[in-house]
């Protein structure tokens, strides 16, 4: 099997590097860099029409969407998925929850943080900040409190997202948890302990050495 990972710095594609290191599979990396506006290069659309990362070429076929990529390799290798039925359901749920529920308010928070610091005419800035503040108060902050409270409670009850064992659910959840810990306010001791636990894994360390961190340091 030939595997080529298109990796963008500070992106979800670190998940794929980590997965492949956990599975001890051979692969090559084509590195891409974000531009000065933190956007992916337009040329990425030459690899896949969406031009979004991760993009993984497997025997010439391009796979996208990190949850689908993790699921594909875990099923193919028969590893990193629970065998207990209840834990299987939890694993599947968190595989979808990470991007479907947790990431949207985090992305909105990031967008408005950039809006507040973006250069604009002085008479526009109070209006833009006022809009951002209203959306944060009515949507972003309540949504983050809800979801981060749920994540924190989950990790107070078990060491990993699916249960007692590390799985692809943990790899999938790492990006939003890391983003939340770097930006969101409040004490999250169980999230911090989980992050420390999973980032101590040799496979994660190898992936980070090759691809860098998931999110920029503030």
Regions found by a protein language model. Give the residues of each.
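GST-like domain detector, emphasizing the conserved glutathione-binding G-site
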Residues: 1-130
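Conserved G/P- and acidic residue-centered "switch" motifs that form tight phosphate/ATP-binding loops
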Residues: 56, 170, 201
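Residues at helix-coil transition
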Residues: 74-75, 156, 199-200
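GST-like fold's C-terminal all-alpha helical module
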Residues: 98-197
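Long hydrophobic alpha-helical segments typical of transmembrane helices together
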Residues: 187-218
């Amino acid at each position: 099997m030939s595997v080529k990972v298109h990796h963008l710095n500070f992106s979800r594609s670190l998940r794929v590097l980590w997965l492949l290191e956990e599975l001890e599979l051979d692969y090559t990396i084509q590195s891409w860099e974000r531009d000065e506006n933190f956007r992916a290069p337009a040329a990425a659309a030459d690899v896949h029409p969406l031009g979004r990362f991760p993009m993984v070429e497997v025997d010439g076929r391009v796979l996208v969407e990190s949850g689908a990529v993790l699921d594909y390799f875990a099923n193919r290798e028969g590893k990193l998925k629970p065998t207990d039925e209840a834990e299987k359901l939890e694993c599947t749920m968190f595989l979808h929850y990470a991007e479907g529920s947790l990431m949207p308010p985090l992305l909105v928070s990031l967008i408005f943080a950039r809006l507040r610091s973006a250069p604009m005419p002085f008479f526009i800035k109070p209006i833009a900040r006022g809009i951002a503040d209203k959306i944060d108060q009515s949507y972003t902050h309540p949504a983050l409190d809800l979801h981060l409270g749920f994540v924190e409670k989950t990790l107070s009850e078990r060491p990993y997202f699916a249960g007692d064992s590390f799985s692809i659910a943990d790899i999938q959840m790492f990006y939003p948890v890391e983003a939340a810990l770097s930006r969101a306010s409040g004490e999250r001791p169980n999230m911090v302990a989980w992050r420390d636990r999973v980032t101590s894994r040799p496979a994660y360390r190898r992936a980070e050495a090759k691809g860098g961190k998931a999110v920029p340091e503030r």
